[in-house]
Swiss-Prot record:
Family: Belongs to the universal ribosomal protein uL1 family.
GO CC, any one term: cytosolic large ribosomal subunit
Gene3D superfamilies: 3.30.190.20, 3.40.50.790
Sorted UniProt keywords: Repressor, Ribonucleoprotein, Ribosomal protein, RNA-binding, rRNA-binding, Translation regulation, tRNA-binding
Its biological purpose: Binds directly to 23S rRNA. The L1 stalk is quite mobile in the ribosome, and is involved in E site tRNA release. Protein L1 is also a translational repressor protein, it controls the translation of the L11 operon by binding to its mRNA.
PANTHER family, per the entry: 54S RIBOSOMAL PROTEIN L1, MITOCHONDRIAL, LARGE RIBOSOMAL SUBUNIT PROTEIN UL1M
Summary of subunit composition and partner proteins: Part of the 50S ribosomal subunit.
Protein name per the record: Large ribosomal subunit protein uL1
NCBIfam families: rplA_bact
GO molecular function term, any single one: rRNA binding
Source organism phylogeny: Bacteria, Pseudomonadati, Pseudomonadota, Gammaproteobacteria, Thiotrichales
UniProt keyword Repressor present: yes
Length: 231
């Protein structure tokens, strides 16, 4: 415990919780306080000016990060015929219909994203209690129920992140790894914030993007001054 306490004291001495850091400085600081032996993810939290208790203010969607997330993404697709062929060609690891549903029911789910063509939802709909709790249930609002399954596969492979506002009005997602360059992380953050602005509910009034903070997997949050970003 003493080691953890010492580390936290050192980190606290380097980070001013009241300060909003310029983006590049925030990423440099994030790397500086990272002391674990694995390559941490860079996570971002965005506080939005919405009331998620109201259905017309629930912000959800997806963003394709220009520099990816640094993660290898395995994709499963529910489709048949030409759509299934297109999904395989796009790089999907698993493609099927009833046979894939049977594997899911057995607990064989070696994939990170599930995509479905609209005509496959009669099969996928039966898997809600299995896929839903794992955050894998396809949904048209985030582009995982689509006629163009090949594009959805390519987007997922390229580093698409999905987001949904939580009960506190905050979006949590990842924008890369600590070994990304600051420019790459900045571009990813800009893309995410741009997409969040596009997803602003019409009924949302006042300041929409209220606060942005970044952190590594095991690190503390660092407040970011996003006023100079290209969003």
């Amino acid at each position: 415990m003493a080691k953890v306490s010492k580390r936290m004291k050192e980190i606290s001495a380097k980070i001013n919780a009241e300060k909003k850091y310029p983006v590049s400085e925030a990423f440099d600081l994030l790397r500086e306080v990272s002391s674990v032996k694995f390559v941490e993810s860079v996570d971002v939290s965005v506080a939005l000016g919405v009331d998620p208790r109201k259905s017309d203010q629930v912000v959800r969607g997806a963003s394709v990060l220009p520099n990816g997330t640094g993660k290898t993404v395995r994709v499963a697709v529910f489709a048949k015929g030409p759509a299934a062929d297109a999904a395989k060609e796009a790089g999907a690891e698993v493609v099927g219909m009833e046979d894939l549903a049977d594997e899911v029911k057995k607990g064989n789910m070696d994939f990170d994203v599930v995509i479905a063509s609209p005509d496959s939802m009669r099969v996928v709909g039966q898997l809600g209690q299995i896929l839903g709790p794992k955050g894998l249930m396809p949904n048209p609002k985030v582009g995982t129920v689509t006629m163009d399954v090949a594009k959805a596969v390519r987007d997922a492979k390229a580093g698409q992140v999905r987001y949904r506002v939580d009960k506190a009005g905050i979006i949590h997602t990842t924008i890369g790894k600590v070994n990304f360059t600051s420019d790459a992380l900045k571009q990813n953050l800009e893309q995410l914030l741009t997409d969040l602005k596009k997803a602003k509910p019409a009924v949302s009034k006042g300041i929409y993007l209220k606060k942005v903070s970044v952190s590594s997997t095991m690190g503390p949050g660092i407040n970011v001054d996003f006023s100079d970003l290209n969003i």
